[in-house]
Structures are given as C-alpha cells and as structure tokens.
Design a protein with these regions (language model features):
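Metal-dependent catalytic neighborhoods of phosphoester/phosphodiester hydrolases
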Residues: 17, 50-68, 84-103, 108-109, ...
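Cofactor- and metal-binding active-site motifs of prokaryotic enzymes
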Residues: 54, 74-75, 83, 120-123, ...
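N-terminal active-site segment of His-dependent metallophosphoesterases
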Residues: 1-69, 76-77
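Active-site neighborhood of phospho(di)ester-bond hydrolases with catalytic His/Asp-centered motifs
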Residues: 7-8, 44-48, 79-86, 108-111, ...
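Surface-exposed alpha-helical segments enriched in charged/polar residues
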Residues: 33-37, 69, 73, 98, ...
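A short helix->loop->beta-strand "cap" motif at the edges of active sites that frequently abuts
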Residues: 73-79, 182
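His/Asp/Glu-rich metal-coordinating catalytic cores
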Residues: 88-190
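Generic signature of intrinsically disordered, low-complexity segments enriched in small/polar residues
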Residues: 19-22, 31, 67-70, 146, ...
C-alpha cells in the first residue's frame, strides 16, 4: 500500500512580527526528512505556500531546493508533488521543473490551458508505491485564480461554484485514466 505524507503552508522565508523563522524552518525540514525515512513514505505532497512571498529570497529558495535534493537522495523511491499556493509565484515555482523532475518532483504552479480551456490531464500525477506500481492518481491543483475556471451562470458565490465545477471536470477526466485498483487523491490550495 502506498504511503502518502501531506503537508502545506510552509511559508519559507517568513518573519513573524520581526522574528526571523529560518531556524524553525530548518528544524522542520530536518524533522520532515527524518519522518519520511522512518515511515518509508512513498509520496510527499506540499499543498501550496511553499514560500511566504511571491518573490522569495535566494536563501529561502536555496533552503527549499537543498531540502528537495536531500530528501530525494536519502529516499531513492520518494516522489514529491507540489502545488502553488496563493503566496507562491506560480511561474517562479515551476521555473526549475526540468531539473526537479530528475529528482522525482512534480510542480503544478499554473493551470495549463489550450484555447482558454484547462488541460485537466496535465494536472494528473501518477503516484507510485515502492515497487514502482501506480497505486493512485493525484489531482494536483494549484491555487485557482480568476480565469482558471468557468463560472456557471446564475452562481451566487462565483468562486465556490467555479472551483466546484473545475474539480468536477478534473475528476471526470481522471476517471477516464483510473483503473479499478487506483485511488484518486485530490490536492489543492483553497
């Protein structure tokens, strides 16, 4: 059975009322590496807000990329799935994707589109167990911004209705790929 560890809202680079939280973040990342190794986690999910601001410092970015390098080196079968949150710059988060994919890391920062319509299939990530078998499909949805979703006519709460419709259509797309033994894991930053 696949083992998944879900995290979110790391806010690397944050200061709290003038207090620099770098040491806290470093301790958290060390703890997370140890936990992943001890529990033989197959997939680490980061559901948005990796960074505290859309233009994170070089030190914050270095902290994140060192973590990715370390955790994937120490755990050769580990997959990472990262979605952008409202604090993250979607494009900045996706920029090093070709390098990160070499470390079994998928990042979904923006909703890919063709002719204005979401390419739902591009938001689906296969999750594999330690034997390399696909046990689940991850519906990896970054923070949805206006323009990422269609608002149904007559919707009272346009954001809620649009997001609901987006997820419904994504699930329908995933169901076409899903086998009877694969789970669906929906991940988003709302």
């Amino acid at each position: 059975m696949i083992s998944i560890l879900h995290t979110a809202d790391w806010h690397l680079g944050q200061s709290f009322f003038g207090y620099d939280r770098t040491d806290e973040h470093l301790h958290f990342l060390d703890w997370l590496c140890d936990t992943i190794r001890q529990h033989e986690v197959d997939v680490l999910i980061i559901a948005g807000d990796v960074f505290d601001v859309s233009n994170p410092s070089a030190a914050s970015q270095r902290m994140f990329y060192r973590f990715v390098s370390r955790v994937t080196t120490e755990n050769p079968a580990l997959q990472l799935v990262v979605v952008a949150g409202n604090h993250d710059s979607a494009a900045r988060l996706e920029a090093p994707l070709p390098l990160l994919q070499e470390m079994r890391t998928e990042i979904k920062g923006v909703v890919p589109k063709r002719e204005g319509k979401p390419l739902y299939d591009d938001l689906i990530v296969e999750l594999k167990n330690a034997r390399g078998e696909v046990e689940a499909l991850c519906l990896a949805v970054p923070f949805l911004r206006q323009g990422d979703y269609v608002v149904p006519e007559g919707a009272e709460n346009t954001y809620a209705a649009g997001v609901r419709m987006f997820y419904q259509e994504l699930v329908q797309c995933a169901a076409l790929r899903q086998t009877e033994i694969q789970a669906l894991v929906a991940v988003g930053h709302l």
